[in-house]
C-alpha cells in the first residue's frame, strides 16, 4: 500500500496548494475562498499564515506582456514521467490525484524535483495577458531540500481534454461519495501512464512565487505553459462536482508582482516584440 502511505505523508508534511487536512484547514484553522475565511483574510487566520498577507513573492500573478523578459539561457522543460499507481482524492477545496513512487521528475535549472501530485483550480489562478481561463492544472513536484516546482497549464472552454475523459467515471464516483456525506473520499485509479498528462510546449513563463493556499510559503518555482489547452464545459463542471459549493470556485486572486522578473522561454531565437517588454537593439 505504498500509494496510501505516500498520501498520508503528504497530508502530514505538506499543507501546500490545498493539500490540507480533511476539513480544508491547516493547523486547525479553516480557510476558504470567500467571506470571513476568504483569501483577503488568510494572513490573519493563524500566525503561521502571516506570509499570505505580508509576503512579497506571492502567487498567482497576472502575466502581462510589459513584464515579460525573454531569457535565451532558459532550456526546454525536461520531464520524465512513467507508469505509476494513482489515487483520486477529494481535498475539500480541490480535486487532486496523488501518484505512487517513481511517477517521474522534472529538472529546472539543473535541480531535480520529484512528481508528487496534480490538482485543478476552477477558474484559473494565473491570468495570461489579463485573461482568466476556465481552469488550471498544477503538476506539483518537490526537491530534496523541500522546495517546490509547479508546472501549470491553463484551459479554455473547447474540445474535451483526453486525460479527463479517461477519468470521468472516477470523478463521478468521487461526487457520489460526497453526496453520501464522505467529503474526503479517495478513489483508486490504478496504474496510469503519467506521460499522457505531459504536454510538449514551445513556450513557457517562469517566475519565483509561493503556494497559492495557506501557509503561502515562498519557495516555489512556477512554470506556466504558454499554450492554452482545452477542456469541455462539462469537464469543468465534473471537476467542480465533488466539491462543496463554497469551494467550486477555488482560485486565489492575483497578487502583486512586486518587481519580480517573469522570464519567457521560446524555442525560436526570434521573439515577437509584441510578446515581450524588452526590445532588442538593432545592430550597428
Swiss-Prot record:
CDD domains: alpha_CA_prokaryotic_like (cd03124). It holds the Pfam family Carb_anhydrase. It is an enzyme of class 4 (lyase). One of its GO terms (molecular function) is carbonate dehydratase activity. Glycans are attached at residues 85, 112, 182, 219, 249. Strongly expressed in aerial tissues including leaves, stems, flowers and siliques. N-glycosylation is required for activity and chloroplast targeting, probably by facilitating folding and endoplasmic reticulum (ER) export. Its EC number is 4.2.1.1. GO terms for cellular component: chloroplast stroma; endoplasmic reticulum. Its cofactor is Zn(2+). It is found in: Plastid, Chloroplast stroma; Endoplasmic reticulum. Residues 244-284 are annotated as: Disordered. Disulfide bonds join 52-216. Zn(2+) binds at residues 119, 121, 138. Residues 244-253 have a biased composition (Polar residues). PANTHER family: ALPHA CARBONIC ANHYDRASE 1, CHLOROPLASTIC (PTHR18952:SF236), CARBONIC ANHYDRASE (PTHR18952). Belongs to the alpha-class carbonic anhydrase family. This is Alpha carbonic anhydrase 1, chloroplastic. It comes from Arabidopsis thaliana.
Amino acid at each position: 500500500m505504498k500509494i496510501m502511505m505516500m498520501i498520508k505523508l503528504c497530508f502530514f508534511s505538506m499543507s501546500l496548494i490545498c493539500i490540507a487536512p480533511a476539513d480544508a484547514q491547516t493547523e486547525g484553522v479553516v480557510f476558504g475562498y470567500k467571506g470571513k475565511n476568504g483569501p483577503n483574510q488568510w494572513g490573519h487566520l493563524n500566525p503561521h499564515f502571516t506570509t499570505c498577507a505580508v509576503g512579497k513573492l506571492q502567487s498567482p500573478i497576472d502575466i502581462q506582456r510589459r513584464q515579460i523578459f525573454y531569457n535565451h539561457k532558459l532550456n526546454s522543460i525536461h520531464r520524465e514521467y512513467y507508469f505509476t499507481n494513482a489515487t483520486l482524492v477529494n481535498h475539500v477545496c480541490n480535486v487532486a490525484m496523488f501518484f505512487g513512487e517513481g511517477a517521474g521528475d522534472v529538472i529546472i535549472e539543473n535541480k531535480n524535483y520529484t512528481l508528487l501530485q496534480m490538482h485543478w483550480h476552477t477558474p484559473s489562478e494565473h491570468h495570461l495577458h489579463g485573461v482568466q481561463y476556465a481552469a488550471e492544472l498544477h503538476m506539483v513536484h518537490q526537491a530534496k531540500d523541500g522546495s517546490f516546482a509547479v508546472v501549470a497549464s491553463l484551459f479554455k472552454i473547447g474540445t474535451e481534454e483526453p486525460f479527463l475523459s479517461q477519468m470521468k467515471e472516477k470523478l463521478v464516483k468521487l461526487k457520489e461519495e460526497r453526496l453520501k456525506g464522505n467529503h474526503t473520499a479517495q478513489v483508486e485509479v490504478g496504474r496510469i501512464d503519467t506521460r499522457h498528462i505531459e504536454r510538449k510546449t514551445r513556450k513557457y513563463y517562469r517566475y519565483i512565487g509561493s503556494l497559492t493556499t495557506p501557509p503561502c510559503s515562498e519557495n516555489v518555482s512556477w512554470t506556466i505553459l504558454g499554450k492554452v489547452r482545452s477542456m469541455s464545459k462539462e469537464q469543468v463542471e465534473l471537476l467542480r462536482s465533488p466539491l462543496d459549493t463554497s469551494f467550486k470556485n477555488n482560485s486565489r486572486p492575483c497578487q502583486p508582482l512586486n518587481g519580480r522578473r517573469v522570464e519567457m522561454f521560446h524555442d525560436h531565437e526570434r521573439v515577437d516584440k509584441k510578446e515581450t517588454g524588452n526590445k532588442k537593439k538593432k545592430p550597428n
